[in-house]
Amino acid sequence: MAHTAGVPLIVDNTVATPYLIQPLAHGADIVVHSATKYLGGHGTAIAGVIVDGGGFDWRGGRFPGFTEPDPSYHGAVYADLGAPAYALEARVQLLRDLGSAVSPFNAFLISQGLETLSLRIERHVSNAQAVAEFLTEQPNVTWVSYAGLPSSPWYERARRLAPRGAGAVIGFELAGGVDAGKRFVEALTLHSHVANIGDVRSLVIHPASTTHSQLTPEEQLGAGVTPGLVRLAVGIEGIADILDDLRAGLATAGV
């Protein structure tokens, strides 16, 4: 649909990583990652990645930033640079203007994290699948959102596009609403209560009482935040330890 409209398809592949999905192989033009998350894997570095597939034609008349001379860079016309036009403009213009250059040490940390990407993601995915299946069996959990479950509307698509697994981020709803969500998170000891994802450690957050707490209940619902919504970013700890921690939280949350 993007190409029919004459615009590039840009995909944020942060959650899946290239190990699970390679968007360029499915027709995407540009892929972006927050390398802070699973690529680095340990929550120790801040960085981002832009991957230009080099297949989009910027000369369709809708992108003057690519087809007209850039007076700030000696009149360069980026579309004339061929396949890597987007990546080159990002390097010579956006990087210059925004200063978004990763530090050498952060680059080292991301590079080091990439060496274990496949091993980590395999463990993330296997743990997340077990957690999602566990949550579906709990009486005080009303629904679970995870594309690795047959009940998910995205299940078949996930099997086709991401046969190695559906990632490690899970959403679920506690029957007791906001108070149950607070009790659940506060009772956990293995999970870290933070807003991040993509760490080797298991992470949890209850959006209604944290990230979206300044919104009215109506505004929260408009943003897709229900009262008992909990988000898990499942880590690579032993699955028995993860499930034991979740059991304790669910027992404290009540019905």
Regions found by a protein language model. Give the residues of each.
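PLP-dependent enzyme catalytic core of the Aspartate aminotransferase-like
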Residues: 120, 186, 202-255
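Residues that form or flank phosphate/diphosphate-binding pockets in enzymes
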Residues: 18, 179, 241
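Short hydrophobic/aromatic beta-strand micro-patches
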Residues: 51, 171-173, 233-235
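Conserved PLP-enzyme active-site core in the AAT-like
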Residues: 1-137
